[in-house]
C-alpha cells in the first residue's frame, strides 16, 4: 500500500501519513490546525522492502487503515547536560 508523507511546517520532526496524496478528510480539524499546512515529502510503499526510519511500517499501515492517518511525533529532545553529568560521574 502506498501512502503519502507530509511534514509539518510548524513542528520539526512531525510527520503525517495519509492513504492518498492531498486527502486529509480523516485528519481531525484541530490536528490539522496544530500541524499547519502539510508539506509533501514523498510517496512510500508500506508493503515494500524498505523500512521507515523511526516508525514501524506495519504500525503505520494499521493506523491508516483504522483511522485514516498516522501522526509521527518528533523525537524527545536530548538532554545533553544530563548525559554530560552522567559521564562525569562515571569517570570519577
Swiss-Prot record:
Pfam family, one: YcgL
Domain YcgL: 1-85
HAMAP family reported for this sequence: UPF0745
Protein name (record): YcgL domain-containing protein HAPS_0171
Source organism of the structure: Glaesserella parasuis serovar 5 (strain SH0165)
